[in-house]
């Protein structure tokens, strides 16, 4: 339903597909948010989103939470070296018009260190299977930039 739901949303049309996607997001997020401790309701993709909220250019261009989190998923998969999964998400993002590179969210390589610093200031990766560092985030974002240039 995702592709049609997004197209319907952009066309300001309420359809069964859009309704089902919205309900799925609200129900799953609501359940997770209420059944687990706060440290487990977020992760690295959200940390990356939070990092980008510190950029004036990202805020001024009104990028949606889910758009930037979808980019954060690419960063997460790059850090974890899950390249096959990254390729699937990358192709999905491209097909849906979701961000795959910095310029898609009005950011530049000069912004990356600031994003990484802010990403680590919240609770998002406070309890994580491994320590996440600024350099890991910076390196993953720059690797994604290279991947975009090659694809």
Task: Please report, for each region that a protein language model flagged, where it lies by residue.
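Active-site segments that bind and position negatively charged phosphate/pyrophosphate groups
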Residues: 1-92
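C-terminal charged capping/lid subdomain of soluble metabolic enzymes
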Residues: 82-151
């Amino acid at each position: 339903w995702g592709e049609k739901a997004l197209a319907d949303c952009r066309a300001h049309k309420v359809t069964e597909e859009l309704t089902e996607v919205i309900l799925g997001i609200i129900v799953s997020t609501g359940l997770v948010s209420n059944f687990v401790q706060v440290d487990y309701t977020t992760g690295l993709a959200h940390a990356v989103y939070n990092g980008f909220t510190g950029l004036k250019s990202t805020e001024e261009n009104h990028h949606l939470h889910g758009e930037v989190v979808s980019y954060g998923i690419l960063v997460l998969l790059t850090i974890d070296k899950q390249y096959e999964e990254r390729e699937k998400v990358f192709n999905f993002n491209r097909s849906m018009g979701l961000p795959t590179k910095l310029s898609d969210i009005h950011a530049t390589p000069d912004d990356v260190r600031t994003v990484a610093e802010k990403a680590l200031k919240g609770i998002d990766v406070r309890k994580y299977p491994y320590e996440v560092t600024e350099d890991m985030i910076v390196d993953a974002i720059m690797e994604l930039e290279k991947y975009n240039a090659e694809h």
